[in-house]
Amino acid sequence: EMGKPILQGEAEVEKSAWVCDYYADNAPKFLSNKKVKTEASESYISFQPLGVIFAVMPWNFPFWQVFRFAAPAMIAGNVGVLKHSSNVQGCADAIEGLFLEVVFPNNVFRNLTISSSKVEEVIENSMVKAISLTGSTSAGKAVAKKAGSVLKKTVLELGGSDPYIVLKDSDLEKTTEACLKGRLLNTGQSCIAAKRFIIEESIKSDFENIIIEKIKDQVVGDPFDERTTIGPMVSIEARDQLKAQVKVTIDAGANLLYKSITPSNKNNAYHPVVVLTDVLPGMPAFDEELFGPVLSIISAKDKEHAIILANQSCFGLGAAIFTSDIEEGKRIAEFELEAGAGFVNDFVRSDPRLPFGGVKESGYGNELSSYGILEFVNIKTIYIR
């Protein structure tokens, strides 16, 4: 429905199964009572379900993002209702069908086929106890405002403009490989995609030359063809928005370093793979989230300057640092980068075993791991005199 290359779609389904297996194996441990020694004869912490959880989910990973929420929420004893993006209703119906096929009781997971204008009404419903939203920052703010007015718990996973810092001592062959995977997965339509490549100026030209050669190996084409690595964008409107952001960035002084070929029919949603260089703060490619196959290259005088540029963003979802000095990379990832995840010498991605969430305008709360399942439970103190 949204144009994902078929092999990437199959991988998404496998990952969705993985998160279900992960919580089936680990939820009993995560949710078991935790004894705490106090003056009482007995005291412990119990984890009880909240009730109905309302999920508002996007189109870009239409299976994974639902199961990422649903597996922990439902195994903790909650009920799920889903408002999926209108352009992936086939996925929404398929997910509901899966829950009807397995051993869950009837109606513990239902798909609401409603417009976005009805979301506030659902949030206000007294049966809804909490909300999980994955989407744009503007959508997150609107949901948080409404949920706040009725004091309901929210977990928000919003937009990102992930910086990838490349230091002069990095292995450029391995680094460019990771950077390209981080940028072009799902045709660049990912909140945790690499959006800003911040390169020490002494190696900037080498980085550009190597990554462009690797881009030439990408296959733009039919998403049903297993050879395809770059499919169409989700819509012509999304393509046109990205084109406009690229144009404004170039008009502001950035240079167009590379542009790939796309299918010749103009009435399609394909966007070329574009490499912009000499991108500066104040340009859309630096300040905004570019949701598509555009690489924005930014020059940094040195490591300290690169860190400043990386954090010069309203977003804080993921970040990566590439260096041969592993201890320094760990220090920067842990203590310097303002993000919910800091990766060293690899591209940012989610994993059921690790918490996933952002800071700043990338949202709040966590999904996945032991932390994610605790977002939608009542962490209850039990005290016996």
Predicted regions and their residues:
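N-terminal Rossmann-like NAD(P)+-binding subdomain of aldehyde/semialdehyde dehydrogenases
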Residues: 1-41
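Residue-level signal for inorganic ion chemistry
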Residues: 20, 77, 109, 131, ...
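Conserved residues at the C-terminal ends of beta-strands
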Residues: 26, 56, 115, 134, ...
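Rossmann-like NAD(P) dinucleotide-binding subdomain of oxidoreductase/dehydrogenase enzymes
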Residues: 32, 36-174, 300
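Structural detector of well-ordered beta-strand residues that form the stable sheet scaffold
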Residues: 74, 81, 110, 155, ...
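Conserved C-terminal structural/oligomerization subdomain of aldehyde/semialdehyde dehydrogenase
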Residues: 128, 165, 219, 263, ...
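ALDH superfamily catalytic-core signature
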Residues: 130, 138-280, 344
